[in-house]
């Protein structure tokens, strides 16, 4: 009985601590959103939001962009956490394993073949198809045990490099102005986002919410195939559903903002280091932290240069690459 009471007390303490972390992430997200609406070449404080200038810059330009950044950040972070559980690899994430680049290749080829005349929904469908194809290919390697986790990571990186090379060659040899402008898109950016793109942004919301509610399934899957099946989890069904959800999130995110790396890798690890290890709370934390961190990166991209804007993919890569190196050394030391 004493052991049972002790376990219950420890569990309640862990839940209280996790809830405090999640509340803190909500505060960070709201502050990031507030700063994002204020920041720019012209800083507009909340008291100026309803002026004539504020109605243009805040409500017509900055708000739709901030909502898109928030949802893309949440989508990439949640996708990274789910991929790490699916592949049983702590270094898995959409950008590193080539999933985002697969979506990018499909989108670039659609623009090339369509001469820049295809509607945004068709380009999004192509990006989703590319992301799904790459994810299923990698998952097939992982589940057939054809490759170790380390080799699977290298295969994903190699596929990502090949996809990047294809996109670069396509842009270089193109005479289409639309395709040449995709060079900026390939580095990631939200500069062209407005209210016309909010349909894609809203499409991300139900998928992110659904994934955040599947933490118990990922907890069961982490126990191993045999134990998960004994608990009534259909592994084949859930793997396909999760792969489909990841492909949708990554495909729409790439269609909106281009290829943005390291958000899906770094955010889950940072949250695990703070103690959020239960997938039921980790996924919600990833959604909040991913949105907040990408909002902060977008603010840096907008204000770092006067009258110019850095590609947000460059900002996340600059900040995320040192953390990725540290994670690699940490995984090696643990082994």
Curated annotation (Swiss-Prot):
Cellular component annotations (GO), alphabetically ordered: plasma membrane
GO BP term, pick one: cobalamin transport
Spans through the membrane: 25-45, 67-87, 95-114, 118-140, 153-173, 200-220, 243-263, 286-306, 308-328
Pfam family, any one: FecCD
Subcellular location(s) per record: Cell inner membrane
Record-stated family: Belongs to the binding-protein-dependent transport system permease family. FecCD subfamily.
Assembly: The complex is composed of two ATP-binding proteins (BtuD), two transmembrane proteins (BtuC) and a solute-binding protein (BtuF).
The protein's role, per its UniProt record: Part of the ABC transporter complex BtuCDF involved in vitamin B12 import. Involved in the translocation of the substrate across the membrane.
Protein name: Vitamin B12 import system permease protein BtuC
Organism, scientific name: Yersinia enterocolitica serotype O:8 / biotype 1B (strain NCTC 13174 / 8081)
């Amino acid at each position: 009985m004493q052991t049972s009471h002790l376990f219950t007390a420890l569990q309640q303490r862990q839940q209280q601590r996790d809830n405090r972390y999640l509340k803190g992430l909500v505060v960070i997200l709201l502050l990031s959103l507030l700063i994002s609406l204020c920041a720019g070449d012209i800083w507009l404080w909340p008291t100026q939001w309803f002026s004539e200038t504020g109605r243009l810059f805040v409500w017509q330009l900055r708000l739709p962009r901030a909502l898109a950044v928030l949802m893309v950040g949440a989508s990439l972070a949640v996708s990274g956490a789910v991929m790490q559980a699916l592949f049983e690899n702590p270094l898995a994430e959409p950008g590193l394993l080539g999933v985002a680049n697969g979506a990018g290749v499909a989108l670039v080829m659609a623009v090339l073949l369509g001469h820049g005349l295809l509607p945004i929904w068709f380009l999004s469908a192509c990006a989703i198809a590319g992301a799904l194809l790459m994810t299923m290919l990698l998952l097939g390697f992982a589940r057939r045990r054809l490759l170790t986790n380390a080799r699977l990571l290298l295969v994903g990186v190699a596929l990502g490099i090949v996809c990047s090379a294809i996109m670069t060659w396509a842009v270089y040899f193109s005479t289409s102005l639309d395709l040449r402008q995709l060079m900026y898109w390939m580095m990631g950016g939200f500069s062209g986002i407005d209210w016309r793109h909010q349909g894609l942004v809203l499409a991300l919301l139900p998928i992110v919410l659904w994934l955040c509610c599947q933490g118990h399934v990922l907890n069961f899957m982490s126990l191993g195939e045999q134990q998960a099946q004994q608990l009534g989890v259909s592994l084949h069904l859930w793997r396909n559903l999760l792969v489909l959800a990841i492909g949708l999130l990554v495909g729409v995110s790439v269609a909106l903002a281009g290829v943005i790396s390291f958000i899906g890798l770094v955010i889950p690890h940072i949250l695990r280091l703070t103690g959020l290890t239960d997938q039921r709370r980790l996924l919600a934390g990833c959604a909040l932290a991913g949105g907040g961190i990408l909002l902060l990166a977008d603010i840096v991209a907008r204000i770092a240069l006067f009258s110019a804007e850095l590609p947000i993919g460059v900002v996340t890569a600059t900040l995320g690459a040192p953390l990725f190196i540290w994670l690699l050394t940490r995984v090696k030391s643990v082994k």
